[in-house]
């Protein structure tokens, strides 16, 4: 319980910082540090530990297999709603907070051995989906045009993705570098969680029936489907548990921010991100408990 209490404490610290005279762009600065320093260091340390087998492949495939399922559910859920509501859910529901929230929670619930699988799910799954699919949704509903060259440029200039390629090609880092990478990697959890807490905003005035259905899909239905797929594939236990937990992460803050900036149902988008994080602190330990009993 102590590690989980620490996670909640860091989130609350971020929330409390909202009430101080902290710089307006504090969350942006913290995110920048995580993306350019903490996460690349973690990737260089952890990814070489992955053995590419069917279990690792299953972890990578799950977010891509869940994507069309989620899109189909959203299309049905929003058939009587305006296009901006559909666009918001198409952005916010498929994309989970699989790094900033996912890494510390999975580390707490499953241990350090699960982190390589988290990084595989996050970088080859969530990040690529955000870059390719997320950009396409924004373009389709905001401008009507998809800029393929810009999408690819963002993809290959993203530091964590570049370090993922380096780690897979290079393998284990030189021993003299490891202590320094460990120091930088250790900043990921506290900085990321404080940033999430500082960014947490909850708005009223939402369509509660739709909000409830969307939250159930994100936090309950997706993990259940992921479990069914991975179980059928015969995925080894740690990889299965990691991918199921990652599939049940709350909506990505970046996806919510993009939806809000584009004017896609801002109140609904913010509520799914904000309340989703709070409720996931309950649902994820329950999912982990059930997985341990299977």
For each of these PLM feature ranges, what is it?
Residues 1-294:
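Alpha-helical transmembrane segments of multi-pass small-molecule/ion transporters
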């Amino acid at each position: 319980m102590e590690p989980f209490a620490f996670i909640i404490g860091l989130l609350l610290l971020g929330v409390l910082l909202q009430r101080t005279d902290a710089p307006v762009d504090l969350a942006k600065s913290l995110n920048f540090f995580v993306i350019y320093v903490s996460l690349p260091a973690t990737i260089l340390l952890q990814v070489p530990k992955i053995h590419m087998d069917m279990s690792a492949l299953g972890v990578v495939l799950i977010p891509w297999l869940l994507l069309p399922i989620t899109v189909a559910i959203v299309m049905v859920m929003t058939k009587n709603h305006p296009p901006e509501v559909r666009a918001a859910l198409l952005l916010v529901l498929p994309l989970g907070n699989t790094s900033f929230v996912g890494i510390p929670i999975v580390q707490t619930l499953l241990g350090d051995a699960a982190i390589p699988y988290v990084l595989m799910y996050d970088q080859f799954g969530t990040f690529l989906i955000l870059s390719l699919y997320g950009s396409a949704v924004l373009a389709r509903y905001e401008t009507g045009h998809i800029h393929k060259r810009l999408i690819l440029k963002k993809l290959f200039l993203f530091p964590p993705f570049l370090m993922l390629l380096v780690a897979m090609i290079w393998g284990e880092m030189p021993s003299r570098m490891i202590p320094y990478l460990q120091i930088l990697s250790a900043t990921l959890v506290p900085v990321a969680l404080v940033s999430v807490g500082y960014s947490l905003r909850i708005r009223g005035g939402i369509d509660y029936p739709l909000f409830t259905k969307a939250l159930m899909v994100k936090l309950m239905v997706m993990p259940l489907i992921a479990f069914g797929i991975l179980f059928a594939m015969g995925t080894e236990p740690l990889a299965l548990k990691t991918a199921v937990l990652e599939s049940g992460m709350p909506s990505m803050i970046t996806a919510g921010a993009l939806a809000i900036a584009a004017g896609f149902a801002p109140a609904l988008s913010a509520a799914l991100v904000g309340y989703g994080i709070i409720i996931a602190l309950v649902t994820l330990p329950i999912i982990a408990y059930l997985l341990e009993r299977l």
